[in-house]
Regions:
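Positively charged n-region of N-terminal signal peptides that target proteins for export
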Residues: 1-10
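Bacterial lipoprotein signal-peptidase II cleavage site
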Residues: 18-30
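N-terminal low-complexity, Pro/Thr/Ser-rich intrinsically disordered segments
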Residues: 30-52, 56-61
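A short, structured surface patch at a secondary-structure boundary
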Residues: 70-132, 137
Length: 372
């Protein structure tokens, strides 16, 4: 009988091992010398030990060469950038593949499009299909702990990556994912380089927004989704709350938790100065302003004043944590505090980031298309 498990929707965002295992720890006398890092790569063998972001202690016989990323959707793009290739990803969630097909990820690492997605059907993981891909490691969301039990049942090594471990700070979350990859692959130097670039870019924004008086911060709401008569707003404990507050605004939806279902009446009560749409909202800002989406938001002050903006897709979707997180923070700040960021040359910053981080040279037209 086939075994399946449900995947939580983002995010966000989300076999017999070929020589890899999660064995119990050896006696101290048999262990290799430990370092001060969370993971250690033995000088006598290739055994790797690390702690994932759910607190699980993992042991692998060697660095994984066949990886499935099941339920934390930004990770394929983060993984490919960290490793300099998407070839090791043999399986990924269909939602992550959809993002890859419509982003710069596939342009930089086209091999990622070869990853299998059939092990997820209707939001369910088929463990037999996972096993058939013979992964050395499965990466899953720490918010889906039931996945670990499924993989453990067949001895499949797995590691949890968390979207929430850094208080939903998108820049620090992205950095923490790279640090965990550094532990897995014994490459903390790459992780440190990524962290330095991301923090330096984000600091340009927060050096300004950290000094803004509360009375000069406009209110904003991010709609995580708005379709088929359902409205989900980003409350406290969400990426959306981080974007708004770090960019110099006040989250009008802070009274709700996470990505919460809210009524149209509640949204009209909040009546924010600015309305932001995540990548998961089907409608465009123009459709919202013209009342062409299936939920009429035209009575909102932000809509009437044309202050409706949608997160772009670059190397990945810009609403969740991603390798474009510093750019996403700048983009949000430009819309929440436009006067304070009037001197920022955002198109130039995009070009610089894409050259320095991805090795891409974008034209003016490509930059315009990315942010439209």
């Amino acid at each position: 009988m086939k075994k399946t498990t449900a995947i939580a929707a983002v995010c966000l965002a989300c076999l017999t091992a070929a020589g890899c295992s999660q064995n119990t720890q050896a006696p101290l006398s048999e262990q290799p010398e430990q370092t001060t890092t969370a993971a250690s790569l033995s000088t006598e063998d290739t055994t790797i030990r690390f702690t994932d972001q759910a607190g699980n202690e993992i042991e692998l016989d060697r660095p994984p060469e066949r990886v499935i990323i099941s339920s934390i959707f930004p990770i394929p793009s983060v993984f490919a950038l960290f490793r300099g290739s998407g070839a090791e990803i043999v399986g990924m969630n269909p939602s992550a593949m959809e993002a890859a097909e419509n982003s710069y990820l596939a342009k930089v690492y086209p091999e990622i499009l070869n990853a299998d997605t059939s092990f997820v059907q209707g939001g369910e993981i088929n463990i037999e299909s996972v096993a058939a891909l013979e992964p050395d490691l499965v990466i899953y969301s720490a918010q889906n702990p039931e996945e670990k039990a499924l993989y453990d049942s067949l001895g499949i090594p797995s590691a949890a990556f968390s979207p929430a471990g850094q208080g939903f700070d998108c820049v620090e979350t992205y950095i923490s994912w790279n640090e965990l990859l550094g532990d897995i692959y014994g490459d903390n130097g790459t992780a440190a380089d990524i962290a330095a670039k991301a923090r330096a870019a984000a600091k340009k924004v927060t050096d300004i927004t950290d000094t803004i008086p509360e009375e000069e911060k406009p209110s904003a709401v991010i709609l995580f989704n708005c379709a088929n008569g359902s409205i989900k707003a980003a409350g406290t404990g969400s990426f959306g709350d981080y974007w708004i507050t770090a960019a110099g605004g006040v989250n009008a939806a802070a009274e709700v938790k996470g990505h919460a279902d809210v009524s149209i009446e509640q949204l009209y009560t909040w009546d924010p100065d600015i309305l932001l749409l995540s990548n998961f909202v089907p409608a465009s800002p123009d459709q919202v302003i013209k009342g062409e989406n299936d939920t009429d938001l035209t009575g909102l002050r932000a809509v009437q004043e044309g202050k409706v903006y949608k997160y772009p897709t670059g190397f990945y979707r810009w609403y969740p944590a991603s390798s474009d997180a510093p750019l996403s923070l700048e983009w949000t700040a430009l819309h929440i505090q436009p006067e304070r960021f009037a001197d920022f040359d955002f198109p130039a910053d995009i070009k610089t980031w894409y050259t320095d981080v991805y090795g891409l040279t974008l034209s003016d037209e490509e930059v315009q298309a990315l942010t439209d």
